[in-house]
């Protein structure tokens, strides 16, 4: 029965992903063991996502959790699981995610409090910030991650996320103008991703003046450990460089530097003080070492991909208490994450609207690049407005539509359903 419980957890995970990506989807829990049953399944209509989430919440609570016990060794943190990773902790996290989507704050707190009992105090001692880097496989903080392994002559099960999250490789271990030791020399020169300016930027103002551009001072990671370097006549502004003294002090321009910067943002070789070209010229980072794969061969990324971790659950508790208008508990859980990051706590209560914004921004900082942000923005009903407002690319802006909050069900599946399945939001948007 524990194996059946794990299967229920995996089913819930798949439907969590489906409802996050497609919204309402066909839902069934029966065995598809005949051609007739397959034909029936193909013609199922969309089931409202909130109904799917509630049914799976109940299923996990009643039919999965009871089979994960101390006696059978399965009531444990994911890092302590001997032969599986999709057990008790993941079940609790999925229940909490389902409840948050359905705005059932008390319902979400039940599994979140169980996770807190299981994982204990959230702090640097128990959960080192350095271990949020994906190169650390199944650390204590993990709740669920995709398992990878790759070696030239052994197991080869890998992804390629690191190849688009590392700075552009110029060859011979030089990444965007900076030699990086320990990351190999064979990674292809892929077009790497970069967050928009809302996430992190330190760009000097136009002209021969050492002042910050006022249009970019509301970045989520602010300040960055960057300082003015030399005036560039072509750019008509100062270039910037890593400030090693500020990094060592943990403070720059009178403000604390978020400890997450060194892992989540790629500014250059922080130890050597060598700055990436894109950072030097434009004041923006690449994705950071959190995503980089040591000794990567070609694009074979052997890191595990972190899907859920304890910091996420802590911030979910803050969100629940905020919606229940409990300011004291909201700030307590929010500040657990901020304390580990080494930034000042939120102590001045100015209203639940401000607290809501603080939680949303903290989730962006803490969980950036961990496959959750779009789901959060859609869940909060602000995906289109926020994405449109902060997208730097004018061409991309022209193609964005509110219906893009969800993917359309593919035409092939709509046809197989006899067009019981449709994409009404896309049709209403003229697509």
Task: Walk through the language-model features, giving the residues of each.
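Long, intrinsically disordered, low-complexity segments
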Residues: 55-57, 132-192, 198, 297-307, ...
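An aromatic- and glycine-enriched ligand-binding surface/loop that stacks and positions planar moieties
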Residues: 29, 57, 61-68, 85-270
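Glycine- and aromatic-rich loop/turn segments at beta-sheet edges
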Residues: 24-27, 31, 65-80, 121-129, ...
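Short coil/linker segments at helix-helix boundaries
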Residues: 24-50
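Extended, hydrophobic/aromatic-rich amphipathic alpha-helical segments that build helical scaffolds
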Residues: 1-27, 53-68, 81-116, 144, ...
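Extracellular loop and loop/strand-boundary signature of outer-membrane beta-barrel proteins
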Residues: 40-45, 81, 302-303
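C-terminal substrate/ligand-recognition segments
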Residues: 233-337
